[in-house]
Amino acid sequence: MTIDYYETLSVERDADQGTIKKAYRKLAMKYHPDRNQGDKEAETLFKECTEAYEVLRDESKRRIYDTYGHEGLKNNGQRDTGGAGDIFSHFGDLFGFGGGGGRSQARRNGPIEGNDLRYDVSISFMESIQGVSKEVKLSRRETCWTCEGTGSRPGYQPQTCPTCNGRGQVLRSQGFFQVSTTCPECEGEGQVIKEPCNDCHGEGLVKKTKTVAIKIPAGVDTGARMRLRGEGEGGRRGGPSGDLFVIVHVSSHEFFERDGDTIYCRLPVSMTTAALGDTVDVPTVHGKKNLKIPAGSQSGERFTLRGEGVPSLRGRGNGDMVVELHVETPTGLCEEQKKMLRDFHSFCEEHGQHEKTKGFFAKLFDEVLGKNK
C-alpha cells in the first residue's frame, strides 16, 4: 500500500522546507527505535516518515512526486531511500550538522551509530538442549534524550571547530613534509560543544543499567553467537543504537557428551545383564527410554537411539544418541561367590566357551615368540 507523503508528515501540500523539517523532526523523535524498542508499529511509522522526508526535502524529487506520484519516483529511480544508514542520516540535517566540508565532513558531523557490546552467558548442558530464557543486567551508555544525543544544552548547537575549521584534521609540518593529523581541539569531530548538556556533560550519552531478555534456542553449543539488534550502546546525533552480541558457553555434563547434534553416553551394565541380555532404562535428554541389550553383549558395544539427540538449529529434527556399554566387573566378592565363579569358569573351559579367548592369546604368543627366535 502506497502512502501519502504529506499526510504521513501531517503537513499541507504547499508547506515550506522549514515546516517539513520541523514536522519530520517531531515524528522521527517520537517513533525513534531507541525510544520504542520492540515496538514494530513504531518502527514502521519511523520508516514511513523517513521515506516521506527523503522525498519532500528534495525539491527535485518533490516536483516529480507532486506531478506523477509514486510511479514518477519509481520510473526516475529516485524512490530508493537506502539502508538504515541513509534513514538515520537525515538526523544530521535536523540537528544542525549539515552543510559545507564535503561528504567526509557530512559523515563526521552526522549521526553516529552506537558501539556494539559483547556479553558472555553460561548455561547448563540441559538448558542448551531444551532452550532457555535469561534476563541479564547490562550497564551501558544510552542516548541522552535531554539533548537528543547532540551533547549540547537544549537550545544550543555545537560550533564549528576554530582550530580545524570543521575538517577534523590539521596539517603539521615535519621537515619538508606536511602531515595531516587528528585535530586536538575537537578530536576529529569538526565541531566543539560550547554549552554542554547538564545530564550527559557533552557526551551525548548517559550511563544506565537495563535488564535485557535473552532467548536462547534449543540446540545451541559453546561458542554460539546471538545478535540482539539495537541493544548495544546508544547512538549520538540521532544515530541508531549498536547491537549486543551474546556468546554462549555450555557447561559439561557428568553423563552426556555432545558432538554436533549427536549425544554420547557410557552405560554401566552388570556382567550378568551383558551375558544374559535384558531390557534396561536409559536416561536421555528427552526422558527415560528402553534399550534392549542382546545376550552376549560386550563392553564397548554401541547402540543407537534414533531421534534422542540434540534438536537441530536448522529445524531438521533431533540428532541421535549413541549408547556405549560398559560391562562392570564385580568386586568385593565373598568366598562363596568366588567359588561359584571358579566353577562357572571351569564349566566354560570344559565346554569350549573360551575358545575365542584362547585362540586370540595363542595367536599373539606365536607372533611374539616367533619374532624372538
From Swiss-Prot:
A Pfam family annotated for this chain is: DnaJ
| UniProt keywords, alphabetically | Chaperone, Cytoplasm, DNA replication, Metal-binding, Repeat, Stress response, Zinc, Zinc-finger
* Xref: CDD domains: DnaJ, DnaJ_C, DnaJ_zf
Task: Note how many cofactor molecules are bound and how.
Answer: Binds 2 Zn(2+) ions per monomer.
Q: Which InterPro entries does the UniProt record give?
A: DnaJ, DnaJ_C, DnaJ_domain, HSP40/DnaJ_pept-bd, HSP_DnaJ_Cys-rich_dom, HSP_DnaJ_Cys-rich_dom_sf, J_dom_sf
In which domain of life is the source organism classified?
Answer: Bacteria
Q: What does this protein do?
A: Participates actively in the response to hyperosmotic and heat shock by preventing the aggregation of stress-denatured proteins and by disaggregating proteins, also in an autonomous, DnaK-independent fashion. Unfolded proteins bind initially to DnaJ; upon interaction with the DnaJ-bound protein, DnaK hydrolyzes its bound ATP, resulting in the formation of a stable complex. GrpE releases ADP from DnaK; ATP binding to DnaK triggers the release of the substrate protein, thus completing the reaction cycle.
What protein family is recorded?
Answer: Belongs to the DnaJ family.
Q: How is this protein organized at the quaternary level?
A: Homodimer.
Domains: entry comment: The J domain is necessary and sufficient to stimulate DnaK ATPase activity. Zinc center 1 plays an important role in the autonomous, DnaK-independent chaperone activity of DnaJ. Zinc center 2 is essential for interaction with DnaK and for DnaJ activity.
The name this protein carries in UniProt is Chaperone protein DnaJ
Question: What species was this sequence derived from?
Answer: Desulfotalea psychrophila (strain LSv54 / DSM 12343)
